[in-house]
């Protein structure tokens, strides 16, 4: 299964969106997909399609040959939280990475005491970030995420198509 596109789903309510994303991309890219899931899942999800679901992310990342065996070209994460080992791999910039469906609850509220207006964020480690809605995109802009990385609306549970930004909001006119 090497090379492949790795899709990680943190929350059970985003699993169907992950499958829809894989179906859409498989038609366009003609590649294989590997799906992992987060600690929030109480049991292994069952795919309605022919995708390889390898298991919980913590089990896979603890396996020393995981990245050698699968060698993903792209890592797509749907929602959070993300395990440290995954974010450290993404931070190394070895893989093209996308964070889709960022929700407000994923954003850190911690402020550094030295720089009170700066919020440390993992989202700068990703190549692209798609947010759940305009409010979340605005929060990312305010929390020091590189402007060119925020690309628009993310996936909805029921739809694969990204939603456009509001034309009335001048904050997003430069995207």
What positions do the PLM features span?
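Nucleotide-sugar donor-binding and catalytic loop/hinge architecture
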Residues: 1-4, 165-175
């Amino acid at each position: 299964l090497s090379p492949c596109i790795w899709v990680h789903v943190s929350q059970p309510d985003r699993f169907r969106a992950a499958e829809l994303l894989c179906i859409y991309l498989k038609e366009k890219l003609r590649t294989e997909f590997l799906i992992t899931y987060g600690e929030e899942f109480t049991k292994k999800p069952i795919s309605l399609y022919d995708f390889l679901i390898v298991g919980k992310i913590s089990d896979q990342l603890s396996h020393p040959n995981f990245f050698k065996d699968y060698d993903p070209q792209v890592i797509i994460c749907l929602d959070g939280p993300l395990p440290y080992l995954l974010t450290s791999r993404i931070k190394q910039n070895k893989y093209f990475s996308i964070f889709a469906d960022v929700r407000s609850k994923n954003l850190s509220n911690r402020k550094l005491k030295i720089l009170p207006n700066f919020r440390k964020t993992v989202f700068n480690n990703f190549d692209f970030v798609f947010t759940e809605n305009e409010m979340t995109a605005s929060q990312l802009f305010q929390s020091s995420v590189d402007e060119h990385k925020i690309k628009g609306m993310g996936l909805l549970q029921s739809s694969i198509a990204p939603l456009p930004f509001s034309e009335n909001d001048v904050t997003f006119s430069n995207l």
